[in-house]
A protein has these predicted regions:
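Short acidic, glycine/serine/threonine-rich loops at helix termini
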Residues: 21-22, 115-119, 170, 195-200, ...
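Acidic, glycine-rich active-site loops and adjacent beta-strand->loop/helix elements
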Residues: 15-17, 108-111, 162-165, 189-194, ...
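Structural signature of cysteine-dependent C-C bond-forming condensing enzymes
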Residues: 2-6, 92-107, 119-131, 144-156, ...
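Condensing-enzyme catalytic core mediating Claisen C-C bond formation in acyl metabolism
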Residues: 7-14, 32-42, 50-52, 207, ...
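Internal metal/ion-chelating core segments
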Residues: 159-232, 238, 565-635, 642
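Conserved small-residue
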Residues: 11-13, 31, 86, 104, ...
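Active-site pocket-shaping loop/turn-to-helix segments
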Residues: 6, 19-20, 66-87, 130-138, ...
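Conserved beta-ketoacyl condensing-enzyme motif
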Residues: 10-11, 35-160, 190-198, 286-304, ...
């Protein structure tokens, strides 16, 4: 055993609202009495589909856990579920889970789909759709919601890897505790029932009209909903306050299939590697794994692949495995933590619940799950795994408090190097082309020609796709996936990394998006058709992680794999997670990308909400303080290649800069306000310079991604108060404001320009005081600063390469 008690991640509180119960006791009773929560649908009208059943959360009194004002503000059911479950977890823990020293890691698949549906329902009925409803529908809404209702101001990671998201969230909570970044983390997931989601899976013909029977018959899944949250603390803090320790998170892994946008690798390779890596990370032996909680969606392709993976993972040993989806249905982004909760409660009651409705092994499934009445057994350790659309896989290893045969890997403070940069924007395809365009004063904002839109934007002009990179198969990709794949491949090439099959597991992928690809075709199919016929091709790309799935497949990247949807300007957060993975030795190389795509319905809604400039300032995009929202949007992708600096030097790589520190914080406040307060940004900056071992006066230049509105004043004020006359550098006023990737692109352009001795390009701020500030001849330290009205603040400190 090699562990530091301070940094062991322990579970001290659980809150759950699920189809089989709304607290731990009720859930355990359902597991014990073999009572599933699958029944006739009551929350949505499914009469036009082949299946009329689902698994719903029932009998929740939101008013007992939420104030009158909160009930008025948060109307989307998934946000209400999240608030109540999180509060239950905090109450169950007894910990003080508030303030700036607490982090959040939250996952969702569909986010506020019920709110998103209103946008399309309003086209065909009198349903109201407003900015307030739209904000609740965004992937990142859950972060601001919990920050404002729970008063949490630490770092916040919003994960969207579809059905594996909350398992990956638990993995990150372990990293944050193990690496000493936080002593308390609130982790969870939430998704609510929605007609658009039900229609999508029905169109794929994977929804069963009978109760799901994983690894057996009938074939098919049942759609579920729900939420679960855990309070995770470091061991010493929990013991010091005499907390009831419910379990330990001792291992984790994420991987990518690199196989198909929706279907799993039929060999079960990705699932096997994920379980294997989680076991290796925990340091326990296969003999210590007493049970596997399988993903077991009930679909033909998933169950066959997972059965192969379990057989390979188990080797010649018998490891009981079960599926709690047979109780709860498939609860989308919350399914991982709901299933882990079910298994943790069962382990603490010395019980392995059975896979319900089992009628014998299905053809093609090589192993038999625990069935019928379950197993009465005292055990100390289990593995829980989930596998999702886009080949996103995640697994965790959970143990009882008394279990000691594990290792908490030591985390070092190694420097992390940026060794490759790739990008695609309205200025061109490639970093060199974009930077050259910046230095020549070119502006990429123009009339929109790809779709109907009366406003201007910085749209990418794609040539025939085969001319972009003849090694890549772009077949089936949407625009955002093309953008990200091009940028990621350029970053690899720029770093001198030529992907080979034998190194695919050494390379990880971190994505950041604010939304998925255009959902118009699917949503219009659902709400402009009485039969609710969704669009199969579009539906598979609506999930935010589909972009990373396409990149993974195109470039054969099979290592650690995650997608963040933390909010506007959050592309720079990928550097924070990259630093955690590399310092934890969970990857050798990492591609970190951010991507955005503009589409017609998005621009129409933004116009309705007053987000678009429509006067003379649209034609000459510069800073204007007359609004907190109005901007000129752009699109594209930027990707960085990262590795440990010692590894980069060993292979004589070209180093653009070293990540000294990367920090995020969260602002709560009024959910609908513009977040003009600078407290969270200032806190992030202070923490970052402390971690980097520098002072504010050491910063030579600031990279930022302004929206071009009053919101940007907090970064200007921070500069003026601590770093007077330091240049502010951005590509935004040349390219248009891309919601997620502009923060990463501005930094990438700056580092590339400095590396090639091109200095700074002339800024288009529109105020001489900012446009013509002189910079040191050779800047040494760059501060990348980002913030937005969605509550997130992101700061990275970069040492410029010599």
């Amino acid at each position: 055993m090699n562990k530091s008690e301070n940094n062991v991640a322990v579970v001290t509180g659980i809150g759950i609202l699920s189809p089989i119960g709304n607290d731990c006791a009720e859930v355990l009773s359902s597991l014990r009495t073999l009572r599933d929560g699958i029944a006739e649908a009551t929350k949505i009208d499914v009469s036009c589909f082949a299946s009329h059943i689902n698994a719903e959360v029932k009998n929740v009194d939101f008013s007992s856990r939420m104030t009158t004002e909160e009930l008025k503000t948060f109307t989307d059911p998934y946000l209400r579920l999240a608030i109540c479950s999180a509060r239950d977890a905090i109450r169950n823990s007894g910990a003080d889970v508030s303030g700036n020293d607490v982090a959040m890691v939250v996952a969702t698949c569909n986010a506020g789909m019920n709110s998103q549906e209103a946008e399309y329902k309003s086209m065909f009925s009198d349903i109201e759709f407003s900015r307030e409803i739209s904000l609740q529908g965004e992937f990142y809404a859950i972060a601001r919601t919990l920050a404002s209702t729970l008063n949490i101001g630490g770092g916040c990671f919003v994960i969207n890897t579809a059905c594996s998201g909350s398992t990956a969230a638990i993995a990150i909570s372990q990293m944050l505790i193990n690496q000493g970044k936080y002593k308390t983390v609130l982790v969870g997931g939430a998704d609510a029932m929605s007609i658009a989601n039900y229609a999508g899976f029905s169109a794929l013909k994977v929804v069963s009209s009978q109760k799901t029977a994983p690894f057996s018959t009938p074939i098919g899944m049942n759609i579920g909903e729900g939420t679960a949250f855990w309070v995770v603390e470091n061991f010493s803090q929990a013991k010091a306050r005499n907390a009831n320790i419910l379990g330990k998170v001792i291992g984790h892994a994420t991987t990518g299939d690199a196989h198909h946008p929706t279907q799993p690798d039929p060999r079960g390779d990705g699932a096997y590697r994920t379980m294997r890596n989680a076991l290796l990370h925990s340091g326990v032996s296969l003999d210590d794994i007493a049970c596997i909680n399988a993903h077991a969606s009930g679909t033909s392709a998933n169950d066959k692949a997972e059965a192969k993976a379990i057989a390979k993972f188990s080797q010649d040993k018998y490891i009981p495995f079960t599926s709690t989806k047979s109780y709860t249905g498939h609860c989308m982004g919350a399914t991982g933590i709901i299933e882990a909760t079910c298994q943790l409660l069962s382990m603490n009651d010395n019980f392995i619940p059975p896979t319900l409705h089992f009628q014998g092994v299905r053809d093609g499934c090589e192993v038999t799950p625990v069935a019928f009445s379950g197993i009465e057994k005292e055990y100390d350790c289990f593995l829980s795994a989930n596998y999702a659309f886009a080949g996103n896989n995640a697994a965790i290893v959970i143990a009882k408090e008394r279990f000691e045969k594990f290792e908490t890997k030591a985390c070092d403070t190694s420097s992390i190097a940026i060794t490759g940069i790739g990008m695609i924007s309205s200025l061109g395809i490639g970093t060199a082309q974009t930077v050259d365009a910046l230095h020549s004063g070119k502006v990429g904002v123009d009339d929109v020609t790809r779709f109907e839109c009366s406003n201007k934007a910085g749209c990418v002009k794609l040539p025939p796709l085969r001319t972009l990179n003849r090694r890549i198969d772009f077949s089936g990709m949407n625009n955002i996936s093309v953008f990200a794949t091009v940028a990621a491949s350029q970053a690899l090439d720029n770093a001198g990394i030529r992907m080979r099959r034998d190194m695919s597991e050494m390379v990880g992928l971190i994505g950041s998006v604010s939304r998925g690809s255009s959902e118009e075709a699917h949503m219009l199919g659902v709400f402009n058709d009485s039969l609710r016929r969704g669009d199969i091709g579009c539906f598979s790309n609506v999930t935010a992680n589909s972009t990373a799935g396409w990149v993974s497949k195109a470039l054969e990247i099979k290592g650690a794999n995650i997608t963040f949807t933390s909010g506007l300007n959050s592309g720079i957060q990928t550097l924070e997670y990259a630093q955690m993975l590399l310092r934890g030795n969970e990857a050798k190389y990492l591609v970190a990308f951010a991507a955005d795509e503009l589409y017609a319905q998005q621009m129409k809604s933004y116009s309705d909400f007053g987000y678009l400039r429509s006067d003379a300032t649209e034609n000459d995009f510069k800073m204007k303080y007359y609004s907190v929202y109005k901007t000129v949007f752009g699109e594209g992708s930027c990707a960085f290649m990262l590795e440990r600096t010692d590894n980069a030097k060993e292979r004589n790589a070209n180093i653009f800069g070293e990540v000294l520190a990367s920090v995020s914080t969260m602002d709560g406040g009024d959910f609908y306000n513009a977040n003009l307060d600078s407290d969270g940004l200032c806190r992030a900056f202070e923490i970052a310079i402390m971690q980097a071992g520098i002072s504010a006066s050491d910063v030579d230049v600031i990279s930022w991604s302004p929206r071009g509105t009053a919101q940007d004043s907090k970064i200007i004020n921070l500069r003026d108060s601590l770093m007077a006359k330091v240049p502010l550098v951005t590509s935004v006023f040349h390219t248009g404001y891309a919601e997620t990737m502009s923060s990463l692109q501005s930094l990438g352009c700056l580092l590339y320009s400095l590396k090639n001795d091109n200095g700074l390009w002339t800024q288009r701020f529109g105020i001489d005081f900012f446009d013509n500030v002189e910079c040191k001849e050779q800047p040494k330290i760059v501060a990348s600063l980002a913030s937005s009205h969605t509550g997130g603040n992101y700061v990275s400190i970069i040492k410029v390469a010599d």
